[in-house]
Amino acid sequence: MAEGPLEAPFWRKGLLVAGLDEAGRGAWAGPIVVGAVVLPPGEYPFRDSKLLSPKARERLAEKVKEVALAFALGVAEAAEVDRLGVLKATLLAAERALLSLPLAPEALVTDYLPLPTPLPLLSPPKADEKSPTVAAASILAKVHRDRIMDELDRLYPGYGFARHKGYGTQEHQEALLALGPSPVHRKRFAPVAQAPLRFPEAP
């Protein structure tokens, strides 16, 4: 962030800026989670969650909650991803996160997510590397989603959700072939669609 954070022009105008980022878009199983964070103007140690160890993410998630003016999470379940597609489900989770914020933001920054909004919006690629609010949102989203996947691992043992968090790995592929898709797998994704059905179909 050598050139200054993305939200700096909004901060200079005195606007409340919400950063949004998601976790789980490319996973084969589990929800998409979007974090929304409003930070006061300043400098922060927050980085893209993908660059952090799980322990560092947990520690920084607590820091985000301490310093944020507001934060919220929105979730789109696997069934909604199947019904709507990845982009629309991500936008739905983002809408839920924004509606859950206790403060109404006056400008938005996202990581290449084209939110339909009347508010001023910056949505460049790799915004989580250039914006502390987006990085903070990515940390909250990732930590929350990891906890969901840990719980799903207990509900649906054998898939390795606690290890791969629902993403495509050889272990996950082999579990799908052996067990078939679980109720929290995304049936639209080819590796899931091609696996033999063992669980009853949801109504």
Swiss-Prot record:
Keywords: Cytoplasm, Endonuclease, Hydrolase, Manganese, Metal-binding, Nuclease. It is found in: Cytoplasm. The keyword Manganese applies. Its EC number is 3.1.26.4. One of its GO terms (biological process) is mismatch repair. One of its GO terms (molecular function) is RNA binding. Its cofactor is Mn(2+); Mg(2+). Residues 15-201 form the RNase H type-2 domain. It holds the Pfam family RNase_HII. A divalent metal cation binds at D21, E22, D111. It is an enzyme of class 3 (hydrolase). Manganese or magnesium. Binds 1 divalent metal ion per monomer in the absence of substrate. May bind a second metal ion after substrate binding. One of its GO terms (cellular component) is ribonuclease H2 complex. It catalyses: Endonucleolytic cleavage to 5'-phosphomonoester. The keyword Repeat does not apply. Belongs to the RNase HII family. Endonuclease that specifically degrades the RNA of RNA-DNA hybrids. NCBIfam families: PRK00015.1-3, PRK13926.1. This is Ribonuclease HII. The gene is rnhB.
